[in-house]
């Protein structure tokens, strides 16, 4: 027993000595920790810059996720890691100076501190930019944080994206980029948008939109023709006076609006002014040329210029244009006679080259003109002439009246059928609803009668219980109430209402309008309107068609008018070839 007690006391002393030794080792070996700042003991304070100061020119890629706020306004601190010589990884605080703020001088940007001017700079390469002045010009200065290569968007036809060169370098950028590029919404894009809006505003002020007055003021209707049109009309009148003087004394010369279609004819002899006016009217496709004797020129030079082959007429004689004599004749024909060479339908040549390939015909060009005698009305009337045509307007009155009657009949017949059918459906629905309502009232009356029986039964029971006191009324010392049963009156009215509903329903079904044609008449009524309209259309349709055909025929006949048809007569020239004269 004593040995066991000594052993336990010895174990307690050993445990106490071990705990004391552990506390001493902890106290002497590890030291104290900074309360609340365990990272400061491991990495030191950020402002101490244990990793040193990093130059902005070095290619450093900081990690923003571990950046800390520096109490100094001109420093930016980053936690960077590096591998040691023994293979361990060590982290230290490195500091980079922030860009200095350029103060403004007299409400103008301050002077620039750097002299590197970049031609382009993308907005994703820097965080902030500020304005500065250099040699009287305003620039944007910023510290680049990454590089970027310029790239195309969807091929070379799009604008080029701006690039950036130099990490952590202070660069300047002008407000306008010398190259056509985009900087991702930066200063260049903003100034370009402002310049475009300014140019659009200048254009709007320089060329204001025309605002027409709603009132059309009268003005004199004089001759307001361009010189070319006047020359064409004068030349045409000269030709008409030479061919038909009687018609030229009193006539109308009308030209079509829009693109003119000149008419070719063979070598018309006319004055120089006439030829100039005729040649000025060449602007469209030519017409077919059907003449008695037509002289064509053909050349088949393999090294020549193709001018085309005429295919809208038949050549009576073809001459090969290969010799110098023929070339001289071509030039002489144009100089003396002012003829044209038609090789295709849409082109006319005043002269042909030395070497050419094709088949051409000699012709002159006359304008597409309509000639109307002076005593006849103009087919294309003016506004005043249209307002006075009352006789033709009368022809449309029967047509309009017939269309109005037909439309009214169709609408009335269809509406009548639909309204009658709808009335029948509404009457049936109303009868059914009233019958359902009367049945509901009858059920309520049955409930009231059963409740009255229960109340009367309770009254008799209370009178028996209070018989010694003279009844329930004397016991309560109140006026006695009695039940007046009027359920018979309500039931009589409900029965009469149901009988009236049955009579109305029977009378509705006994109507011949609904029982006609074995019950099909209600379904045929909505189609009576369209059926009547079809019959009316078949009756009046031939008359309307005949009237419209006659009116269209009169319009076509009235628009026909005589055209210029020059008379062509083949006469031999001094070279032996036939020549046409007007």
From Swiss-Prot:
Name-wise, this protein is Envelope glycoprotein
Give the quaternary structure. Answer: The mature envelope protein (Env) consists of a trimer of SU-TM heterodimers attached by a labile interchain disulfide bond.
Q: Which organism is it from?
A: Avian reticuloendotheliosis virus
Query: Which residues does the record list as glycosylated?
Result: 241, 301, 314, 485
Q: Which residues form the signal peptide?
A: 1-35
Keywords recorded for this protein, A-Z: Cleavage on pair of basic residues, Coiled coil, Disulfide bond, Fusion of virus membrane with host cell membrane, Fusion of virus membrane with host membrane, Glycoprotein, Host cell membrane, Host membrane, Host-virus interaction, Lipoprotein, Membrane, Palmitate, Signal, Transmembrane, Transmembrane helix, Viral attachment to host cell, Viral envelope protein, Viral penetration into host cytoplasm, Virion, Virus entry into host cell
Any one Pfam family here would be TLV_coat
Q: What is known of its domains?
A: The 17 amino acids long immunosuppressive region is present in many retroviral envelope proteins. Synthetic peptides derived from this relatively conserved sequence inhibit immune function in vitro and in vivo.
Motif (CXXC) positions are: 251-254
Renumbered ranges of motif CX6CC = 473-481
Identify the stretch(es) annotated as Immunosuppression.
Answer: 456-472
Job of this protein: The surface protein (SU) attaches the virus to the host cell by binding to its receptor. This interaction triggers the refolding of the transmembrane protein (TM) and is thought to activate its fusogenic potential by unmasking its fusion peptide. Fusion occurs at the host cell plasma membrane.
Q: Where is this site: Cleavage?
A: 392-393
List all disulphide bridges recorded for this chain.
251-254, 251-481, 473-480
């Amino acid at each position: 027993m004593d040995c066991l007690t000594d052993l336990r006391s010895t174990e307690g002393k050993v445990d106490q000595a071990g705990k004391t030794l552990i506390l001493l080792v902890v106290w002497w070996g590890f030291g104290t920790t900074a309360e609340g700042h365990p990272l400061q003991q491991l990495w030191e304070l950020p402002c101490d810059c244990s990793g040193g100061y990093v130059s902005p020119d070095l290619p450093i890629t900081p990690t923003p996720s571990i950046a800390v706020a520096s109490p100094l306004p001109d420093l930016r601190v980053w936690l960077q890691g590096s591998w040691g010589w023994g293979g361990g990884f060590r982290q230290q605080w490195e500091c980079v100076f922030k860009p200095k703020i350029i103060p403004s001088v007299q409400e103008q940007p301050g002077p620039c501190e750097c002299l590197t001017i970049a031609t382009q700079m993308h907005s994703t390469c820097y965080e902030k930019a500020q304005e500065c002045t250099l040699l009287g010009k305003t620039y944007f200065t910023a510290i680049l944080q990454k590089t970027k290569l310029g790239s195309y968007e969807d091929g070379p036809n799009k604008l080029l994206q701006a690039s950036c060169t130099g990490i952590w370098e202070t660069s300047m950028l002008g407000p306008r980029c010398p190259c056509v590029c985009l900087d991702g919404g930066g200063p260049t894009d903003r100034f370009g948008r402002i310049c475009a809006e300014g140019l659009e505003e200048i254009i709007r002020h320089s060329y204001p939109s025309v605002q027409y007055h709603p009132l059309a003021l009268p003005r004199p209707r004089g001759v307001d023709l361009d010189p070319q049109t006047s020359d064409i009309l004068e030349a045409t009148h000269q030709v008409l006076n030479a061919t038909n003087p009687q018609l030229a004394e009193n006539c109308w010369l009308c030209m079509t609006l829009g693109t003119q279609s000149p008419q070719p004819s063979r070598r018309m002899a006319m004055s120089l002014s006439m030829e100039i006016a005729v040649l000025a009217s060449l602007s469209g496709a030519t017409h077919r040329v059907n003449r008695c004797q037509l002289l064509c020129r053909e050349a088949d030079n393999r090294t020549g210029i193709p001018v085309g082959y005429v295919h809208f007429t038949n050549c009576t004689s073809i001459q090969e244009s290969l010799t110098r004599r023929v070339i001289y004749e071509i030039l002489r024909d144009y100089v003396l006679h002012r003829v044209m060479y038609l090789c295709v339908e849409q082109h006319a040549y005043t002269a042909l080259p030395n070497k050419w390939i094709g088949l051409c015909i000699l012709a002159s060009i006359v304008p597409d003109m309509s000639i109307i005698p002076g005593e006849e009305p103009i087919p294309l009337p003016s506004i005043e002439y249209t307002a006075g045509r009352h006789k033709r307007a009368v022809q449309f009155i029967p047509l309009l009246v017939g269309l109005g009657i037909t439309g009214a009949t169709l609408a009335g017949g269809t509406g009548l059928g639909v309204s009658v059918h709808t009335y029948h459906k509404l009457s049936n629905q109303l009868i059914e609803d009233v019958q359902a309502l009367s049945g509901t009232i009858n059920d309520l009356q049955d409930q009231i009668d059963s409740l009255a029986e229960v109340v009367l039964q309770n009254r008799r029971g209370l009178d028996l219980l209070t018989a010694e006191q003279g009844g329930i009324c004397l016991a309560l010392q109140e006026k006695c109430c009695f039940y007046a049963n009027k359920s018979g009156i309500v039931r009589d009215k409900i029965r009469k209402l149901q009988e009236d509903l049955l009579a109305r329903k029977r009378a509705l079904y006994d109507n011949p309008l609904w029982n006609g044609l074995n019950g099909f008449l209600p379904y045929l009524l909505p189609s009576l309107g369209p059926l009547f309209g079809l019959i009316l259309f078949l009756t009046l349709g031939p008359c309307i068609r005949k009237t419209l055909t006659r009116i269209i025929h009169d319009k076509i006949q009235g628009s026909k008018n005589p055209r210029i048809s020059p008379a062509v007569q083949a006469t031999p020239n001094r070279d032996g070839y036939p020549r046409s004269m007007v």
